[in-house]
Amino acid sequence: MQKITKAIIPVAGWGTRRLPITKVIEKSMLPVGNRPLVDYSVQELIEAGVTDIYMVVSNTEPCQVREFYSDNIVLNDYLISRGKGDRVALTKTLPEHVKIHYIAQDANSKYGTAVPVAMAAEEYSLNEPVIVYMGDDFIWNPEGESAATSLINSLQSENDSAILGVEIPKEKVDKYGVLEVQDGKLTNVVEKPSVEEAPSNLINVSKYILSAGLLQKIVNYVNEHDFGPTDQEYMITDPIYAYIKQGQTMRVASTSGQYLDGGSVEGWVHANNVVCGVKEA
């Protein structure tokens, strides 16, 4: 199995779909059970062998993500003084060998899923394969292989990239980007196709392994394009499409886990119900 030790997680933005609560709680910090959304991805990546995580955060203070992954000495002292020292371990959110690096993104700059990836790659001169996860969703699979491990296991050479495909009922494909797959490789992503025209029932949930070559292509795409004062986004899928059309390989990994999306109220409630074992009507 190829070893990948670096991951990028974009968590910047106002989370406007979740206003007004996101005025005071960052979207990626919305609670699922007793943990924030983003921590499910962080712990999964650590379990898969990642030791350096590059978080692209908003350039506002305070940064709740940074606070969550930092020691709180005042809280620890309080717990100890009240005879609750056994709870100090619950405040340790990162093992000692893992480091989170923070990159601040201006909300008024270029935007889209490619931008934070390019920012992290340039800021830290990344020139090796990296895992990319978004910060407001995760794969729930407590008894099985993690999605990150499935992605890594799908690679057959150091030049391969990979994308995670999540299987859903065919009648729901018209809400997603659907993967077109041939011999285990991605050939296209069809956005919101009709049920009849969908090439599969595997959807894109924006979880990738990017080879060093594809990572550089994403950096170039963001730097070389200027969409000006428009609403056009710098989508990570654009350089990915260009990359595979050049004959490069993006493997398609699958997971037996459940995709949980906290980006909407309904998805967030469902994620809490699943994680907490609450039966839904």
Please state what every model-predicted region is.
Residues 14, 137, 265:
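Active-site metal-binding loops of divalent metal-dependent hydrolases
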